[in-house]
Amino acid sequence: MATQRASGLLQRLAQGSLVKQILVGLILGILLAWISKPAAEAVGLLGTLFVGALKAVAPVLVLMLVMASIANHQHGQKTNIRPILFLYLLGTFSAALAAVVFSFAFPSTLHLSSSAQDIVPPSGIVEVLRGLLMSMVSNPIDALLNANYIGILVWAVGLGFALRHGNETTKNLVNDMSNAVTFMVKLVIRFAPVGIFGLVSSTLATTGFSTLWGYAHLLVVLIGCMLLVALVVNPLLVFWKIRRNPYPLVFACLRESGVYAFFTRSSAANIPVNMALCEKLNLDRDTYSVSIPLGATINMAGAAITITVLTLAAVHTLGVPVDLPTALLLSVVASLCACGASGVAGGSLLLIPLACNMFGIPNDIAMQVVAVGFIIGVLQDSCETALNSSTDVLFTAAACQAEDERLANNALRS
């Protein structure tokens, strides 16, 4: 009887809401740090183990995921979605640019276990570009061992294109390996509540409760930037496309897509909701049936904001100087990282080390930034997904309505 109860409890823990479990871990960590400082410092080992597991699995995940995605790409699918694709890419880059501006206007700092003396900052854009180029030609084994994500991406893309010409058995093997690594990542993510409990407890025990304000400030910057993109940047892009008041369409998408995505925290799970909204808006079925799933994969404005804000928070914490060209390059890198965020369990957070590489920030410190992201992830991930998913249907509707008006005007002229 006791065994059955124990197995039932474990099953509920394994299948329960990760968001609620992280929230419980966060609260318990705060309480433990408040009640007993020595005990809170002791359970810091749980957080260290969690961050170590993330560090171990992330490089392999990026390699296998990108390689499998390119190798298994299907040829011959012809759709007229260029304007939507352009809006997706422009919107993601605009979000990253807005995040850079927001981060410099309201700089955030984090509590990291390394000082600025550990960092050798790049002197400017030329050195950053040189470092990126040298990272690209790194040995693949060396890139995996040292978590050189630029080198990993180059090898993953190259091998992916090479394997496109391989037989189906090879492609299936690569796909199965990708699924296996993804399973391992999901397994690690299931321990996030325990890791967060350890991280919060030890952090508060060693730095004090003032750390919470630092995270609150970071969260305000993140969510504030996402609101800026949702209510100012995206409406400007939609107005540029349809040449009329964009806000009725913007609010409809936020209300009927964003709210669902906020609670599901999954762009993929929100695809049926977006499809139904597109049908309600009388959009072209052949267009939205392709653009909505595509948007769930590459339209990642929220992820671009998360990557940019957290990377610059680490940069500000470590005192690394950033010039304007480097900040612009970060916007481009964050946009490219964001386009790959959909396939990563844990979302955009595990792609932060890739952006941190630009500034000479070691993988150890970058993974501490990822851990901070998990601490604030209860709200951050929900807001990020709401922005990502609602923007999918918003840009699809804008492009379709603009095309309908163009065809109507041409018909009147003729």
Swiss-Prot record:
Bilayer topology annotation: Multi-pass membrane protein
Chain ranges passing through the membrane: 16-36, 46-66, 84-104, 143-163, 180-200, 219-239, 300-320, 332-352
SUPFAM superfamilies from the UniProt entry: Proton glutamate symport protein (SSF118215)
The organism's place on the tree of life at top rank: Bacteria
Subcellular location, principal: membrane
GO biological process, one term: serine transport
Compartments, as annotated in UniProt: Cell inner membrane
Sequence similarity: Belongs to the dicarboxylate/amino acid:cation symporter (DAACS) (TC 2.A.23) family.
Known role: Involved in the import of serine and threonine into the cell, with the concomitant import of sodium (symport system).
Protein's name according to its UniProt entry: Serine/threonine transporter SstT
Organism: Salmonella dublin (strain CT_02021853)
Gene transcribed to yield this protein: sstT
